[in-house]
């Protein structure tokens, strides 16, 4: 579309992974179609992914541990970074709740309240996920994510341009307007 800056997928370049030192031994995987992000769900492979996320260094976590204990990410960075976290578009208890200012005063402590990429990742057998960006200055940090399944999609030193990655079908996109 002319005038309104709607990017075509061909114009979208992948985000650059940032250099961070992880303070725990988290298993990682390169984000690409077919990758597995849950060690205990080997058949839950990525079916589709927003082009911005292609090649990021994601974490391969244990979903049941996330559900029981939540997820803690500890890291050090020499520069400001954004940690990308995917929240599934489903309100079942097994999925972590996305940050919402209406119900959680800390929901924007890291600039994460609004999703940056909606309908951005589709995993076999799971709902679509939206991507939120948590911003951290240089230094040592510990992020505690809520209990439930989330996707830890990696660190970047670039900002994420908000958009609908449109991996949903037409009906799902309409549903999203009323979500």
Regions found by a protein language model. Name each.
Residues 79-91:
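A short beta-strand element within beta-rich, extracytoplasmic domains
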Residues 1-23, 136, 144-148, 155-179:
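Activation corresponds to long, low-complexity, non-globular regions
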Residues 4, 9, 17, 47-49, ...:
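Residue-level detector of intrinsically disordered, flexible termini
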Residues 3-4, 65, 93, 125:
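Intrinsic-disorder/low-complexity loop/linker signature
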Residues 62-65, 69-82, 132-141:
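Extracellular and analogous surface-interaction loops
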Residues 11-66, 168-179:
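Glycan-recognition and processing domains
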Residues 96-164:
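Contiguous ligand/interfacial binding patches
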């Amino acid at each position: 579309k002319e005038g309104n800056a709607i990017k075509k997928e061909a114009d979208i370049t992948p985000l650059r992974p940032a250099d961070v030192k992880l303070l725990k031994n988290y298993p990682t995987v390169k984000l690409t179609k077919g990758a597995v992000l849950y060690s205990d769900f080997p058949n839950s492979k990525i079916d589709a992914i927003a082009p911005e996320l292609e090649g990021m260094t994601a974490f391969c976590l244990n979903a049941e541990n996330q559900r029981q204990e939540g997820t803690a990410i500890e890291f050090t960075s020499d520069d400001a970074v954004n940690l990308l976290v995917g929240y599934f578009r489903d309100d079942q208890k097994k999925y972590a709740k996305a940050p919402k200012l209406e119900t959680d005063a800390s929901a924007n402590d890291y600039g994460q309240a609004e999703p940056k990429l909606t309908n951005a990742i589709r995993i076999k057998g799971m709902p679509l996920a939206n991507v939120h960006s948590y911003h951290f200055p240089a230094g040592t940090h510990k992020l505690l994510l809520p209990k439930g399944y989330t996707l830890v999609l990696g660190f970047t030193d670039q900002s994420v341009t908000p958009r609908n990655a449109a991996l949903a079908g037409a009906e799902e996109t309409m549903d999203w307007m009323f979500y």
